[in-house]
Amino acid sequence: MASEKSYKTVPVTGKNLAMIYHHMGNKTQSLEEAYKQLEKELGETQAPPPSPQSSLDGEPLSEGELEEISEEEEEEGEAPPPIPAKKRQRKNPSKAPAAKAPRNYGTPSYMLHVDLKHDIAGVLEEIRRASLKKPAHTPSIRNRTYPSITKRYLYERDSKKLQQYLDDSKKLLAKYSEGV
């Protein structure tokens, strides 16, 4: 009933080399010699005979019990098919979700206070021309620079803030004129 296993040579892997090195201990032989010696020892070693007490209770199993166990394992090996995922159901399956109405923002921000924005654009164009003469010179008024005013004034809706942008851009133009 018990079949003897024939051992193959140990493949040279990191784990096996570590085992060989550990087996060597403090001996002065090379790894190759230790590998050959270990291979020889493993070749001489045979598989131990099967234990008569193979059950967990410590009692040996009869041949009938072994056959029953093997039949049960074969039956358990067949797995049931996987359960399909459930689809998410809506509360009212007959009704489709209503489309949202687009929001009406009124007049776009770039259309508000157009005359004031044109004045700011004229001043910013003069600043751009002045900045080309001396590109390293970048003055600021109240932490506002030419690029920051350029980015923000088009989208501003408040006329007071736009008036402040116009005043700041005029002051910046004066600083650019002085610096040149």
From Swiss-Prot:
InterPro entries per record: Adeno_L4-33K/L4-22K
One GO term (biological process): viral DNA genome packaging
Region Disordered, residue ranges: 31-108
Acidic residues bias spans: 60-78
UniProt feature, compositional bias: Basic and acidic residues: 33-43
Protein name: Putative protein 33K
